Structures are given as C-alpha cells and as structure tokens.
C-alpha cells in the first residue's frame, strides 16, 4: 500500500490486504448513483464517495442527535482499473437519483481456471455491484 505524506487521503491498493484497508476507509460512504461510472473502453470504474474520515479523531465537543461522536466527512475519488465486466444486483430503477450507503468492498472467489478477480461493492438495503478485474488496482484520493 502506498500512502502520500499529505493531510488528505491518497492510497493505492494492489492486493487483498490493501483492499481490506480501502474497504474500511470507505465503510458507510454515501455514493450518488449519478457519481458512479464504468468506462468499458478504458476498463475503469470511477466513483465519488462522501466518506467518513475514520482515520481522524472524532470532532471535539460535538455529538450527533443520539449522543454519538461526530466524524468529519470528505469527498473521495475512487478509481478501479482493469475492469472487464460489471454486474449489478438488486439495483434501484431510478439509479441516477439514488444515494447508496457503501458497506464494504470484498474480494470474492473466482473459478480456479479463471485468473481474474471479482470485487463486490455491497450497499445497505441489498444492492451490490460486482466488478471483474484482471488485477487489483485501486486508487483513492480525497478531493479538494
């Protein structure tokens, strides 16, 4: 995993362990349907996520309506390269207007004879997206 020495988050994920870190950082991120795009010609999936800044401490002297800690949020660009196919399950009909809560990114098992990987994005309420990728190559970058 490569990190960059700035306050904003910049990560490159290249293996399953890196993917787990990316998943943790994107847990509970809100992604608008209009902010997700698969570019088949360039084999990449891109999204803009409004993520919790889990790596930073909770804001001091602030609580939410239930008394819980309040964390900062940041807009984060996500790019997954080497994507050869996208499958959507239980996807909202009005996707462009939908806002989805990302629960996790998971690496799923592929058939033994297949050298590709399958990355699943799971959202609350049941929707999911499966990306078939030739290799794990993900970049996260907080947007200014």
Question: How should each PLM-predicted stretch be described?
Answer:
Residues 27-79, 84-85:
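Short, well-structured hydrophobic secondary-structure segments
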Residues 62-66, 95-103, 136-140:
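General N-terminal targeting signals
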Residues 143-144:
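Glycine-rich, aromatic-bearing surface loops/beta-hairpins
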Residues 1-46:
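Long, hydrophobic N-terminal alpha-helical segment
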Residues 16-30, 85-123, 129-133:
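Intrinsic, low-complexity N-terminal interaction/targeting segments
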Residues 1, 48, 53-57, 68-72, ...:
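Hydrophobic, ordered structural segments
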Residues 11, 52, 59-61, 98, ...:
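Residue-level detector of solvent-exposed, low-hydrophobicity positions
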Residues 2-5, 13-18, 45-50, 70-74, ...:
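A generic short-segment signal for beta-strand/edge and adjacent turn/coil regions
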């Amino acid at each position: 995993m490569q990190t960059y020495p700035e306050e904003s988050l910049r990560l490159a994920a290249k293996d399953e362990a890196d993917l787990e870190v990316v998943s943790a950082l994107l847990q509970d991120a809100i992604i608008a349907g209009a902010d997700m795009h698969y570019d088949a010609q360039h084999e990449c999936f891109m999204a803009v996520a409004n993520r919790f800044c889990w790596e930073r401490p909770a804001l001091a002297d602030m609580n939410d309506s239930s008394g819980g800690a309040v964390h900062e949020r940041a807009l984060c660009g996500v790019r997954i390269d080497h994507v050869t196919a996208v499958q959507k399950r239980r996807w909202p009909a009005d996707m462009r207007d939908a806002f989805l809560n990302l629960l996790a990114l998971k690496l799923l098992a592929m058939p033994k004879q297949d050298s590709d990987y399958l990355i699943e994005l799971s959202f609350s309420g049941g929707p999911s997206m499966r990306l078939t990728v030739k290799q794990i190559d993900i970049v996260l970058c907080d947007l200014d």
